[in-house]
């Protein structure tokens, strides 16, 4: 038998390249491949994050542009409208439960807050008393206009239906095209009836007494004389009696 060689023959790859397969070099190549794959994965993640940041920045720019185009006091108006809507919902809830809204509101705030709100209200809208009829009518007009609550749902619906004609120009013809809804007409009639009832309550005409002494020149002067008699009558009663008897000094 031929003698068995102790050393095996080299592989064809090793014979051609002349490089031996070193385990250390193979491990180094695997480590380099893993690092390269890790770097590529991180690069893809950074690329996705950059695209997401670019998208968010664009959205913020659009929102900021919308805010800049709004009126200066838009945020304050929006907050106030939201607060008024919450108050209206609370009032409806109290009516459904059969409770008094003013009483419920006072139970939810402290006495100090209630006094502070009352001072602010009087400072903002002071009651200076009666000065003339024009001022009284103006105060009534302002009070009634403050009671008008905006209906944002109908406003948005009307704006959607009108389209570009919602903001009229010099060539727009919108006069006489608005038709009030039945709920609005009923609300106006109810409010007018309340005003009439309140006016009759506070200024109902007294029946005329034919036997009473006439010490006035007109109805307004008669009211003034009655008011003066109510406040100063007890001090002037003796003087009037002396004048009537002719014994006044």
From Swiss-Prot:
Query: What's the main place this protein lives?
Result: nucleus
Q: Where is this region: Disordered?
A: 1-22
Q: Which UniProt keywords apply?
A: Coiled coil, mRNA processing, mRNA splicing, Nucleus, Spliceosome
* Disulfide linkage: none
Q: Which GO terms describe its biological process?
A: mRNA splicing, via spliceosome
What is its subcellular localisation? Nucleus
Highest taxon of the lineage? Eukaryota
What are the annotated GO cellular component locations?
A: nucleus; post-mRNA release spliceosomal complex; Prp19 complex; U2-type catalytic step 2 spliceosome
Q: Which residues form a coiled coil?
A: 34-95
Question: Which InterPro entries does the entry link to?
Answer: mRNA_splic_SYF2 (IPR013260)
Family recorded in the similarity comment: Belongs to the SYF2 family.
Subunit structure, per the record?
Answer: Identified in the spliceosome C complex.
Explain the purpose of this protein.
Involved in pre-mRNA splicing as component of the spliceosome.
Q: What is this protein called?
A: Pre-mRNA-splicing factor syf2
Q: Which organism is it from?
A: Gekko japonicus (Schlegel's Japanese gecko)
Gene behind the chain: syf2
């Amino acid at each position: 038998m031929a003698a068995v060689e102790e050393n095996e023959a080299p592989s064809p790859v090793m014979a051609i390249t002349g490089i031996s397969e070193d385990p250390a070099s193979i491990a180094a190549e695997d480590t380099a491949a893993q690092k390269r794959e890790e770097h590529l994965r991180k690069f893809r993640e950074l690329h996705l994050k950059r695209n997401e940041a670019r998208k968010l920045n664009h959205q913020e720019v659009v929102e900021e542009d919308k805010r800049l185009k709004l009126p200066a006091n838009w945020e304050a108006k929006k907050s106030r409208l939201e607060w008024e809507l919450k108050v209206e919902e609370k009032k409806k809830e109290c009516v459904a439960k059969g409770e008094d809204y003013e009483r419920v509101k006072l139970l939810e705030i402290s006495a100090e807050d209630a006094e502070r709100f009352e001072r602010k209200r009087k400072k903002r809208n002071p009651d200076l008393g009666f000065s003339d009829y024009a001022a009284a009518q103006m105060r009534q007009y302002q009070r009634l206009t403050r009671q008008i609550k905006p209906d944002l749902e109908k406003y948005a619906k009307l704006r959607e239906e009108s389209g570009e004609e919602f903001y009229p120009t010099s060539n727009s013809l919108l006069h006489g095209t608005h038709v009030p809804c039945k709920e609005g007409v009923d609300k106006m009639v109810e409010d007018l009836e309340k005003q009439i009832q309140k006016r009759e309550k506070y200024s109902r005409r007294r029946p005329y007494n034919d036997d009473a002494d006439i010490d006035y020149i007109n109805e307004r002067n008669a009211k003034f004389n009655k008011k003066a008699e109510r406040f100063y009558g007890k001090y002037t009663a003796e003087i009037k009696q002396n004048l009537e008897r002719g014994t006044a000094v």
